């Protein structure tokens, strides 16, 4: 019997023998692909090859790809659905097509796996007669070949656009006794008799976002076989949780909860959810996903919180997901070593997120049960669902799932309306922007598709030839003064925006014209687009041109880029090796570095990181680059950007001998660290859970920043009439004095308001059988108003108190209702809401106490006079 690890290796070796290059799994975060939330299929990392915008080093490839699909999260817990899974695949980019794909697939399942041919059926796309003929050549009887429509046998695209095509699937037949028993039962029947093993996609088209399809440059092959499903079959198990993939993880869940697997259905469901989601969140975090309110971060948060919820149903009241993740890492790190490498970070992130949700879970569940009890008409309102989401962290899908268990639905339209009120959308656009499909179209229409030769590591000026000119309308022969365009050169000293470093600016000059380069972009096929505008004259295709970059700007960028590399080493020295780069931006003015860390840096940590960088600057260490095989670079421990894809040969940038920093980098740098001159951190902040950001300046900008700080300190010292070094102490004394005076004023206000409150008691009147006290108070703040209302409520015993004042030049209202009157239907929150609306504001609160304010203080008295009409 094959183990799952043996099956994985067996498959990859089989296709290596067929001339395929083994490719490592890419990250669950798709590289440079805005059409996908997460990696959903083995072909995702190869999309540029299928689109024809990049060329693979080997046109035959095979991989075992980590995949994640979000469509069935609520279904996880049954015997079949998973979020995270492994996809075995073999791929041809314009090399072989249907004949070889079908022959090798049949050979593998019948000869390598020894699955009896009589247990196998195949399905094909309706009109794919070619595939049918090829299956027959392999000996598959016509009676076990089934034609199906697009819903079953047309694959893709992975996202809203991309490669796609008809497909053919291999199915395993468990036997007539396992299904519906009908004589005409075939793989289109959902009775459970048949199990899809392998999907062979014949990639022929590129589909755009509108659904329009165009033929790809060369037909290709994309196959996918789920390792988990294959393991079930080869280990003769009922479901994936009984295979060696999940058995150790299920065992850990049983050990933690004291429950047994296989005893009752509800316990099994909870154990499966906890185990499957633990695996999913472990891989997501290891691949760089961070819990968030949107996007892939929301998927992670949703999984983690669903796991916690079902853990509670197993009696797991204390945090348990760190232990579960440990079991996942122990089981899978032999195949995916990044799990071991990032274990500390993964576990810390899980602990933090689980603790955050645990704080609100119990209260949220109590509120949800109350909502369920009070819900009439069978539907929980969107407003209630939003409150559970916004206040208690309940993903709406989780609320929907719990509601369904109670026979209720959720008003998702109302929930979305509430979300829209809160949601802010940031959009950015560029005149020249390229998504996957648009890039393919631009490259296809170029007259010159060869890679631009970058000479900018050595040169800042270069004689070149204009190979192409692109405008919004496509390629043109010439451009004139005022025209905006992108110029393609055969050789260029301009660095194209990549790896967080901004593109170079400068000029392209010909005998007849001058072109200002405002930015330089890098297309997937290696072509550089020099974007800008014609300043004077005319530029034409095939002209010789002098390309000049802005050298001073380049030097500023180089200072910041090299400093970024040293900073990453500094952070690992100060905070620990678990620090991972999560992004960077390098501009002439400053650098921005995002990294994984769960808490704010202390002042001491910031100072130590800064001192580390400046020490390396003072040492004037050599900065040098060399090319080497990617595998050698990893063996040497060179730092690679998390989630980035690299070719077989890479450029390694080192600082110092021996190196204090060694990273894969294609950017431009100083030649010695001393050229950076000075490094200064200007801010350290949070940009999300477990994600920190440092902004820093170097060189001239650092000097300017320090000068500004010194000027500010000098001005402050003058105002305090103290020496600069004495200013902090002087300021602290002044603040203490102000705080003391504030307390004195508050005490005086409190005494005055108490006296005023005593007088107010006599103004309480009987109105509709209740005691009502409505009054405007002067010279009190909101806190004092609250204390006054407490005093009046205690003295009245029973009644409604409405007080108003002007605080910070705005009207402020406070209402209290005693318990006996709440039972009669009076509600402080409703009263304050109406008062605040009169004054141009808003407010509300609980039945017993509420407060609110407005914008127009002139409306204060009018609002108070309207109280009786509200009762």
Curated annotation (Swiss-Prot):
Residue ranges the record marks as coiled coil: none
EC number annotated for this UniProt entry: 6.1.1.7
Keywords: Aminoacyl-tRNA synthetase, ATP-binding, Cytoplasm, Ligase, Metal-binding, Nucleotide-binding, Protein biosynthesis, RNA-binding, tRNA-binding, Zinc
Binding site for Zn(2+): 561, 565, 665, 669
S-adenosyl-L-methionine among keywords: no
GO biological process, one term: alanyl-tRNA aminoacylation
SUPFAM superfamilies, per database record: Class II aaRS and biotin synthetases (SSF55681), Putative anticodon-binding domain of alanyl-tRNA synthetase (AlaRS) (SSF101353), ThrRS/AlaRS common domain (SSF55186), Translation proteins (SSF50447)
InterPro entries linked: aa-tRNA-synth_II/BPL/LPL, Ala-tRNA-lgiase_IIc, Ala-tRNA-ligase_IIc_anticod-bd, Ala-tRNA-synth_IIc_core, Ala-tRNA-synth_IIc_N, Ala-tRNA_ligase, Ala_tRNA_ligase_euk/bac, DHHA1_dom
Localisation: Cytoplasm
GO (cellular component) term, any one: cytosol
Family the entry assigns: Belongs to the class-II aminoacyl-tRNA synthetase family.
Domain notes: Consists of three domains; the N-terminal catalytic domain, the editing domain and the C-terminal C-Ala domain. The editing domain removes incorrectly charged amino acids, while the C-Ala domain, along with tRNA(Ala), serves as a bridge to cooperatively bring together the editing and aminoacylation centers thus stimulating deacylation of misacylated tRNAs.
Its job: Catalyzes the attachment of alanine to tRNA(Ala) in a two-step reaction: alanine is first activated by ATP to form Ala-AMP and then transferred to the acceptor end of tRNA(Ala). Also edits incorrectly charged Ser-tRNA(Ala) and Gly-tRNA(Ala) via its editing domain.
HAMAP family reported for this sequence: Ala_tRNA_synth_B
Name of the protein in its database record: Alanine--tRNA ligase
Organism: Dehalococcoides mccartyi (strain ATCC BAA-2266 / KCTC 15142 / 195) (Dehalococcoides ethenogenes (strain 195))
